[in-house]
């Protein structure tokens, strides 16, 4: 068996996230189904992703790996996969890698983007969160506090099996492109729903639904199951995953 590393894009609007579910369509489920079809294999061919994106979340550079036996060249395998996948999921690159490679555990950085639209647009309803006009300077002051090694327990959905809730954030900034306000964040790892909690909380501060002091306390005094603000999934995009 050869181990393959793939990068893929998907529009998350019609997926119940990345991870296999007992019912409903997932990205992992679609990929495994297509691999079984191409190989005429009845047993499961597990696909492991770098980031387990939630329902409605998109990816421009998700990375995954799987073990597969085929006589097809890499180019032929991409064509076979994309020919059987639905149009909202595309394999962009494929390569054979070392048997020890792991898409999730070998990743050293992940880069996410969250898109907000200051206004109403039917075209962006599945790609951005519609918000009122905002102060970019204040937003970037809030974002800058996230850079560094912090415990993000307050900004995550708590799971007991997690060994720790610390993440190292290398980049955290907002940019403006016309009416599109985009949050860029790069870190070594991210907790469940973390980016959406961060965005929702920063917007809540801007809209005076939460004080700057309370935002700072959430970061400096981490606690689980805080009632906090969460941005909707459709604005979130996994941009790329970095390996050594």
Language-model-derived ranges and their functions:
Residues 1-244:
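Structured-RNA-binding interfaces characteristic of tRNA pseudouridine synthases
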